[in-house]
Amino acid sequence: MSLVIPEKFQHILRIMNTNIDGKRKVGIAMTAIKGVGRRYSNIVLKKADVDLTKRAGECTEEEVDKVVTIISNPLQYKVPNWFLNRQKDIIDGKYWQLTSSNLDSKLRDDLERLKKIRSHRGLRHYWGLRVRGQHTKTTGRRGRTVGVSKKK
């Protein structure tokens, strides 16, 4: 960061219901939004013609608005399908980039659907056990530890 702070520097930006640190580089600062990682923020900033070396607080209102529209409508700006975080949605078969509260609600809906159809994954979620095939004999224990009593 340069020694002189510009006049229109914003220390905290509010983008998509998320506080973004204005002192960080814009590509890294965008990852504070849930559902936006480093690769996705990089491609969004390139589509919006925003300089990747500038700080987030130096961005103008037009640049921020452009970034928000690209994040919310990536397919209109020719972001490839395989780059999005929700591919072939089970309900409508479309491709989406879910962010913030939409991501949370879709994940909750998916888990509820798995529990409702009583699939193996849904039952493991319901029981609070590991889902992806991990061993559970010794690790992942919760509650009180039961030790071995010593013989007198």
UniProtKB/Swiss-Prot annotation:
Localization (cell): Cytoplasm
A GO molecular function held by the record: rRNA binding
One GO BP: cytoplasmic translation
Positions carrying Phosphoserine: S41
UniProt-listed InterPro entries: Rbsml_uS13_C, Ribosomal_uS13, Ribosomal_uS13-like_H2TH, Ribosomal_uS13_CS
Pfam families: Ribosomal_S13
Taxonomic superkingdom: Eukaryota
HAMAP family hit by this protein: Ribosomal_uS13 (MF_01315)
Family that this chain belongs to: Belongs to the universal ribosomal protein uS13 family.
Function: Located at the top of the head of the 40S subunit, it contacts several helices of the 18S rRNA.
Designated name of the protein: Small ribosomal subunit protein uS13
UniProt lineage: Eukaryota, Metazoa, Ecdysozoa, Arthropoda, Hexapoda
Name of the encoding gene: RpS18
